[in-house]
């Protein structure tokens, strides 16, 4: 396990995420959509690995839907502390664990279900993240990612460029964090190369793709 960073740019958003999760079960509507999609495949009795888990709302929700156990990793130590707190509040702390770690460099434990919610867009290069997460995945692999194709993909790239100017101007807060728009088709091809078949592929909130695979 890697040493905990002193501070992560995501720390500033943790309190808002927790507030929303306490009210609605999950911090974001997209997370709820991914949880519903995974529930549709079947979470009962399965183990789950949530990479870039944030405050753990997806993994905790999976336990509520019947998953046997779950584990989450995130770069933000504040988010991990919040995830542990929420798991305790929801009465599932004995079946879930959260650790600070980078999924692109950490040795990941195997799990039946591996999920990456709004994670690929935080990495300049997703090859290592794909390699490690796919190696850990048993029967289900799922992710959400910004659209990269067509007019929406162009819009996303423009929006990301504007956001990255803001992040650079606030380097003291965000460090080297940037938003990246990756080729969704290339990621889909990489996942299929590991023997997964696409079960669900849909657009959410206009600019996001949600994908669930099984093998």
Predicted regions and their residues:
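C-terminal alpha-helical "lid/dimerization" subdomain adjacent to the S-adenosyl-L-methionine
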Residues: 146-190
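Conserved SAM-binding loop of SAM-dependent methyltransferases across substrates and taxa
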Residues: 55-66
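Conserved SAM/SAH-binding beta-strand->alpha-helix loop
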Residues: 76
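A short SAM/SAH-binding and catalytic strip from SAM-dependent methyltransferases
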Residues: 113-125
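Conserved SAM-binding loop
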Residues: 83-84
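A short glycine-rich, Lys/Arg-flanked "PGG" loop and its adjoining helix->strand segment in the class I
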Residues: 128-139
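Conserved beta-strand signature within the Rossmann-like core of class I S-adenosyl-L-methionine
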Residues: 138-146
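Conserved class I S-adenosyl-L-methionine
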Residues: 1-42
């Amino acid at each position: 396990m890697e040493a905990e960073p002193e501070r992560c740019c995501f720390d500033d958003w943790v309190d808002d995420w927790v507030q929303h999760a306490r009210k609605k079960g999950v911090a974001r509507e997209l997370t709820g959509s991914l949880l519903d999609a995974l529930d549709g495949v079947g979470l009962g009795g399965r183990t789950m690995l949530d990479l870039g888990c944030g405050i753990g709302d997806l993994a905790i929700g999976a336990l509520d839907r019947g998953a046997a156990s779950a584990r989450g990793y995130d770069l933000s130590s504040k988010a991990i502390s919040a995830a542990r707190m929420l798991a305790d509040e929801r009465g599932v702390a004995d079946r879930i664990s959260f650790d600070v770690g980078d999924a692109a460099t950490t040795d990941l434990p195997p799990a039946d279900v591996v999920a990456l919610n709004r994670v690929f867009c935080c990495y300049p290069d997703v090859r290592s993240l794909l390699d490690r997460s796919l190696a850990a995945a048993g029967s289900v692999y799922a992710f959400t990612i910004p659209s990269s194709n067509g007019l929406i993909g162009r819009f996303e790239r423009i929006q990301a460029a504007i956001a990255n100017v803001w992040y650079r101007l606030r380097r003291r807060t965000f460090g080297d964090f940037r938003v990246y728009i990756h080729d969704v088709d290339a990621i889909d091809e990489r996942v299929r190369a590991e023997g997964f078949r696409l079960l669900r592929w849909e657009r959410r909130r206009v600019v996001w793709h949600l994908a669930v695979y099984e093998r």
